[in-house]
From Swiss-Prot:
InterPro entries cross-referenced by the UniProt entry: aa-tRNA-synth_I_cd-bd, aa-tRNA-synth_I_codon-bd_sub2, aa-tRNA-synth_I_CS, aa_tRNA-synth_I_cd-bd_sf, Glu-tRNA-ligase_bac/mito, Glu/Gln-tRNA-synth, Glu/Gln-tRNA-synth_Ib_cat-dom, GluQ/Sye
Highest taxon of source: Bacteria
Residue ranges annotated as motif 'HIGH' region: 8-18
EC number: 6.1.1.17
Record's keyword terms, sorted: Aminoacyl-tRNA synthetase, ATP-binding, Cytoplasm, Ligase, Metal-binding, Nucleotide-binding, Protein biosynthesis, Zinc
Main location: cytoplasm
One Pfam family linked to the record: Anticodon_2
Protein name: Glutamate--tRNA ligase
Enzyme kind, highest EC tier: ligase
CDD domains: GluRS_core
Annotated gene: gltX
Gene Ontology biological process terms in this record: glutamyl-tRNA aminoacylation
Length: 488
């Protein structure tokens, strides 16, 4: 049975790159009726926290990436935190020490740094040259009597070609002579990544390791441990780096990189999942919008590119805007409420039926202007009380047209004649005014829009008027007429 895993370090939030790795593992597991495990690589004791671990799990759940075994769900292959598996690592450490594939190293940091500097001065690759490879029991005893705490190093075989048939990158060959003996257990007894990950993948029966390209250089070290222990090696698939639109590695300077940042801004999870799936995976055909189920059916490692993926925020915004337009209005209302409350546009506490209806109408009125839901805050000034923003530039010039006072007066007259201010009652007024004044549509619509919002573009006028309400509309129109009177 196919088994895959996602193994984040709980030292911070789930980032876009990690979310993509989790997604690709999830998709392959679902496609092949396999098992998806999520575990925690928490051996960085200073930086790891249960809070970060939980936040990562919540981010995965928000993306609807569900796992079969692991953190917070349990399973038959636990425990799923590395700090709870130390006794298991010790068993395998003892096996490597007994077979001579590992040894204790007592070199100090100063000695290692000097060796590193000497190799660099010769133009050679920095690596450990094996000073402690053949220590006698007496030499070990002397070091320990001096208070030196050893690490455990893996004895790298010399002159070996390490071949990796990567499912994404093809055949990759490494030379063991360029690696040097590396640490597998630190002096405090905590295993290093390259050792612990092998034991975890083995004991959890992982068949496929799908992870970021940055781990490719670790793979020969892990393969050597598999071979020394006589363990089967999983299939590897190293997915490409994610670059910004300038072709550089993503960083904080490129904006938000954590999944929670996009959740906080009101991106829809299905849009984020769709977007990150297309960073490195090319589905068959021309379609670019997929449900999670559709992605599962179409996914294969053969269609994952080894070329760098590009994080294009404009593409994410485009995709999210599409999903917003497709979303249920009630869901969008729920998403909009916290942002509107935050700015005081609606009251705290449970909304009345009328207040909730106002939010629903407001969101639908501006839906074509939304790339993410936090932008509902950007249009409130159009539709709530108070003066409209003062028009400037071309907008002010349009208001100074000679037909404008008559258009505004006629609009006021017709509004006052309505029994109720609703979209269906307001919408016909503009055609009526156009017909009665014999003016072009733009000569009617634009002055009214600018008078009410101060802007030349925005939501439909027949939406703005009911949202503002008659009192606010009349107030803003009166303010505009006063502005014009003062400038004439």
């Amino acid at each position: 049975m196919l088994k895959v895993r996602f193994a984040p370090s709980p030292t911070g939030p789930l980032h876009i790159g990690g979310a993509r790795s989790a997604l690709f593992n999830y998709l392959l597991a679902r496609k092949e009726d396999g098992v998806f495990i999520v575990r925690s690589e928490d051996t960085d004791l200073e930086r790891s926290s249960r809070e970060s671990e939980h936040n990562i799990m919540e981010a995965l759940r928000w993306l609807n990436i569900q796992w079969d075994e692991g953190i917070e769900v349990g399973g038959d292959n636990g425990p799923y935190r590395q700090t709870e598996r130390l006794a298991l690592y010790q068993e395998y450490t003892d096996r490597l020490l007994a077979s001579g594939d590992a040894y204790y190293c007592y070199c100090s940091e100063e000695e290692l740094e000097q060796e590193r500097q000497d190799l660099m001065a010769k133009g050679e690759t920095p690596r450990y040259l094996g000073k402690c490879r053949h220590l006698s029991a007496a030499e070990r005893q002397t070091y320990e009597a001096a208070g030196r705490k050893p690490v455990v190093r893996f004895r790298v075989p010399e002159g070996r070609q390490i071949l990796i048939n990567d499912r994404v990158r093809g055949e990759v060959v490494f030379d063991s002579d360029g690696i040097g003996d590396y640490v597998i257990v630190k002096s405090d007894g905590i295993p290093t990544y390259n050792f612990a990950v092998v034991i975890d993948d083995t004991t959890m029966n992982i068949t496929h390791v799908i992870r970021g390209e940055e781990h490719l250089s670790n793979t020969p070290r892990q393969v050597l441990i598999y071979q020394a222990l006589g363990l089967p090696t999983p299939e590897f698939a190293h997915i490409s780096l994610i670059l910004n639109t300038e072709g550089k590695k993503m960083s904080k300077r490129d904006g938000d990189t954590a999944v929670i940042d996009y959740q906080a801004k009101g991106y829809l999870p299905e849009a984020v999942v769709n977007f990150i799936a297309l960073m490195g995976w090319s589905p068959p055909g021309e379609e670019e919008f997929f449900t999670l189920e559709e992605m599962t059916q179409a996914f294969s490692l053969e269609r994952v590119s080894k070329s760098p993926a590009v994080f294009d925020l404009n593409k994410l915004n485009y995709m999210n805007a599409h999903y917003i337009k497709q979303a249920d209005p009630e869901r969008l209302t729920d998403l909009a409420v916290p942002y509107l409350r935050e700015m005081g546009a609606i009251p705290q506490g449970t909304l009345s039926e009328e207040e909730r209806a106002w939010v629903t109408h407001y969101v639908q009125a501006i839906i074509n202007h939304l790339s993410y839901m936090a932008q509902v805050k950007d249009f409130v000034h159009y539709v709530q009380g108070g003066e409209a923003p003062t028009p400037e530039g071309e907008a002010l010039e349009i208001l100074q047209g000679e037909q404008v006072p008559a258009v505004l007066d006629l609009f006021v007259e017709k509004l006052k004649s309505l029994e109720a201010i609703r979209v269906d009652t307001v919408k016909p007024l503009f055609k009526q005014i156009t017909k009665e004044t014999k003016l072009g549509g733009k000569q009617v619509f634009m002055p009214i829009r600018i008078a009410l919002t101060g802007q030349m573009h925005g939501p439909e006028l027949y939406d703005i008027v009911p949202l503002l309400g008659l009192e606010n509309v009349l107030s803003r129109l009166a303010g505009t007429k006063a502005l014009l009177a003062g400038s004439r």
